[in-house]
Regions:
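An exposed acidic His-Trp-rich patch
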Residues: 74-128, 321-376
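Elongated alpha-helical scaffolds
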Residues: 39-81, 85-90, 299-304, 308-319, ...
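Short S/T/G/P-rich N-terminal loop/turn motif that feeds into the first structured element of a domain
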Residues: 1-46, 59, 67-72, 107-302, ...
């Protein structure tokens, strides 16, 4: 199952920013029950957010993030079916939206397609698991755990193989779980193999062209160091009152996930913009091979992406992740500092770096201050499975995938320990 990450980014009429914010604030009060965009009816959807961004020197804009199953067209059809009136109401606040008293399907979908922004780099934590499969496997695990609790309570435990046979018989007896026996791979062979082949090909091309690339690389390093030593120093940022506003959309009760939207200004000049595009391309190449639930050792990212917007003048970063903001940033600093610094060292007010990837985020307090300063208030955020972590989803899939496979006693013990 292919998953798609994208945003619809539109300008907002300055005179209607307050109206749009009020509309979104009403949605946020009951995200799952709101009538504007009834998110639970969108069965292809994993995560979504709406952010109104106001920044000096830029028109106010609306960032509508979508992470969903399959290609764009079926998702747009589903979105129109369940949310046409609400989308019409939202985008009526945008100056280039076709004015009409009621939504016109062709115009609305054409408008959304015209404002699609695809990511320059992205990561998916649970590759190949559709939203439907995620819900199904979680329900299966809960049911099997209850069944096993009953077996233990009856004192009828027996050998491990016997317990597993009872579990299999239970699943076969439940009409609700007829789907469980037919396991589709998380990825096809080509989906798993091609990103690795692309990485190898890129390495071979670099090796073959090394006589040409090495002199160019030396020139680039000299230009980089000159740029780093002559740029204006980053502002001395501190965690300001903006944090009080940001945390209103963090650490909700009974939700194990969080959301972050971060918009930075790219440092001026073709050199910095070109370097950032190259870094994002490399990050994306590596991220395509990170299909085991982790990105650079970080096991908490559901969907995340970077997009260059406003003709490359700003960098958008959006992430749906497990745990707190503080722990998430600490994970990045501890486990992915080089990649993190390689990207954001090309943006304004990031902690000072050397050779693109040194220092930077390793100055943890300054990095966190910069991250907060560039973070945008999330007006609306929706998760289709807000109580599941990346690791829980992977564990649920492993339970289902090994349910009817042949296992020895050691593997059976490991399988039962997953509950």
């Amino acid at each position: 199952m292919k998953q798609t990450i994208l945003t619809f980014i539109t300008k907002v009429n300055p005179a209607k920013v307050s109206d749009l914010k009020a509309l979104l604030e009403g949605m946020a009060k009951d995200v799952e029950g709101n009538a504007v965009i009834p998110f639970p009816k969108l069965k292809l959807l994993h995560f979504a957010s709406l952010v109104v961004n106001e920044a000096p020197d830029y028109d106010p804009c609306l960032v509508f993030e979508n992470n969903f199953d399959g290609p764009l067209d079926p998702y747009l059809e589903e979105l129109y079916l369940h949310a046409s009136e609400g989308l019409h109401q939202i985008y009526s606040c945008c100056p280039d939206y076709p004015v009409a008293s009621a939504p016109d399907k062709a115009q609305l979908l054409s408008y959304l397609r015209a404002h699609v922004v695809h990511p320059n780099a992205y990561h998916i934590g649970n590759v190949g698991r559709s939203a439907e499969r995620t819900h199904q496997e979680d329900a299966l695990r809960d049911s099997l755990e209850d069944f096993l609790d009953g077996v233990v309570a009856q004192g009828n435990i027996g050998p491990l193989a016997s317990i597993r046979q009872k579990v299999q018989a239970f699943v076969k007896s439940q009409p609700l779980f007829t789907w469980a026996a037919k396991v589709e791979p998380r990825q096809t062979a080509s989906e798993h193999f091609m990103p690795r082949l692309n990485l190898v090909i890129a390495g071979l091309i670099a090796l073959l062209l090394s006589p040409l690339l090495i002199p160019l690389l030396l020139v680039w390093v000299i230009m980089l160091r000159w740029t780093e030593t002559h740029e204006a120093p980053p502002a001395d940022l501190s965690i300001d009152t903006n944090v009080k506003n940001l945390v209103k959309r963090e650490d909700f009760p009974h939700i194990v996930q969080n959301h972050m939207c971060h918009i930075s200004i790219v440092k001026p000049g073709a050199f910095r913009r070109g370097t950032l595009r190259g870094v994002l391309r490399l990050i994306n190449l590596i991220a395509r091979t990170s299909d085991k639930g982790e990105l650079s050792g970080i096991p908490s990212i559901h969907f995340a992406h970077w997009s260059l917007i406003d003709n490359g003048r700003r960098l958008l970063f959006v992430s749906n992740f497990d745990g707190s903001w503080e722990n998430y940033l600490d994970d990045f600093i501890d486990k992915a500092s080089s990649g993190l610094t390689g990207i954001w060292s090309n943006t304004v007010d990031y902690p000072k770096t050397r050779f693109l990837i040194l220092d930077g985020s390793r100055d943890g307090s300054r990095f966190k201050a910069a991250a907060r300063a560039k973070q945008t208030y999330t007006n609306v955020w929706y998760s289709a499975y807000k109580q599941l972590t990346v690791q829980t989803i992977d564990n649920n899939s492993s339970i289902r995938e090994d349910l009817f496979t042949s296992l020895d006693d050691s593997a059976t013990r490991d399988w039962l320990l997953r509950f």
